[in-house]
Amino acid sequence: MSLDKTQIISQILNHSPSHIIIGYSGGVDSSVLLDITKDLDIPTIAIYINHNIHPDALKWQLHCQTICNNANIDFIAHSLDQAPKGESFEAWASKQRMDFFIEIMSQYSSPILLLGHHLDDQAETFLIQAIRGSGLAGLASMPYYKQLNHGAVLRPLLDYTKKDIQDYASQNKINHIYDDSNENIKYRRNLIRNQIMPILEQINPNISRTLSRSAKICAESSNILQKLLNEKLQKISQNNSLIISELLSLDKDIQKSLIHHWFKETTNQSLKNKQTEEIHKALNNDIHTGWQFDINQQFQISVEYNQLIIKNNNQVDLILDNKDIIEWLKERFNKDFDTRELIVRQRQASDKCRYQGRDKANKLKVLFQELKIPTSERSKAKVILLNDKIIAVYPFFICD
């Protein structure tokens, strides 16, 4: 179908963004997005991520900068380092890109990030997740719209095919670059795009739309499941721990889903299926206090009486030896406290704090973004607790 510029603009404006951020590679997809939004009366920032892999990467960066200068669009270029040894470059680079986008978004009141993923990308993502053996959440692939702690992500081209986008670019004489590394089948997505999808199209000429529809069904089912699990989790959890007797009173499949969901909600990390199975099996074998299971270098799950608890291996128990932290706290905290009762630890994904002068608590990640604390500085944060309540986040702020 033909790309509907008016409809896409309407979908963007429905979210009333203060600023538009575009992930701009110079390729046809993001170039079409830039063309569609360039005349909107909304401040727009195009971000080019230089992966430092292709020999033409700097030339593409200059191309993007020239296009933006000519259209009076703000332009930011960000360069990535090499991926850590042993890590998948695709996964690492994807996280690095999103982290940088979020850092820029945190500077504005209600920004929206536009990404140029299209229907064929969605079909490829579905296959990648299926090959990995992903569950519903993974098979849901890429969401059309996602609310972030600060701003939102929108993929306005997700219902359009690559051909629809190329036709629009041709009709509107849009200048864009072509990345020949997209032909390199050493990358899984390129292998699927260039070799597997053509074979599947022989079976079903509309395979991209079919797989994209399957991803949408999985997304809807996953959303329903998450809501049901959240409701159940509230009933069988206490202070981020699971009440074992309550958990074991449920259907076994629900038990496993809740263990996986509880860990993800608490740590912002996912258990592997094998880990979930092992924890579930141990719980049903009448384990007792003292049982421990290492998830990774950071987290450990243990049993204490009737509770399943997540321990952070990076956690520091006592604050007594942290003189700098004590002095910092004494200067800012307006209540008396016994240093022997204080605990300092690394922050966790579920941590919340009621910032001074506010009526309700927010997740620390939200506060970091609102206070414009750079991503590079957030790793320094230490959570200070008194009587199991967060009273401060060193060296940034005090909580009410």
From Swiss-Prot:
Ligates lysine onto the cytidine present at position 34 of the AUA codon-specific tRNA(Ile) that contains the anticodon CAU, in an ATP-dependent manner. Cytidine is converted to lysidine, thus changing the amino acid specificity of the tRNA from methionine to isoleucine. Gene3D superfamilies: 1.20.59.20, HUPs. GO terms for biological process: tRNA modification. It catalyses: cytidine(34) in tRNA(Ile2) + L-lysine + ATP = lysidine(34) in tRNA(Ile2) + AMP + diphosphate + H(+). HAMAP family: tRNA_Ile_lys_synt (MF_01161). GO terms for cellular component: cytoplasm. ATP binds at S25, G26, G27, V28, D29, S30. The N-terminal region contains the highly conserved SGGXDS motif, predicted to be a P-loop motif involved in ATP binding. This is tRNA(Ile)-lysidine synthase. One of its GO terms (molecular function) is tRNA(Ile)-lysidine synthase activity. Keywords: ATP-binding, Cytoplasm, Ligase, Nucleotide-binding, tRNA processing. Belongs to the tRNA(Ile)-lysidine synthase family. It is found in: Cytoplasm. InterPro entries: Lysidine-tRNA-synth_C (IPR012796), Rossmann-like_a/b/a_fold (IPR014729), TilS/TtcA_N (IPR011063), tRNA_Ile_lys_synt (IPR012094), tRNA_Ile_lys_synt_N (IPR012795), tRNA_Ile_lys_synt_subst-bd (IPR015262). Its EC number is 6.3.4.19. The gene is tilS.
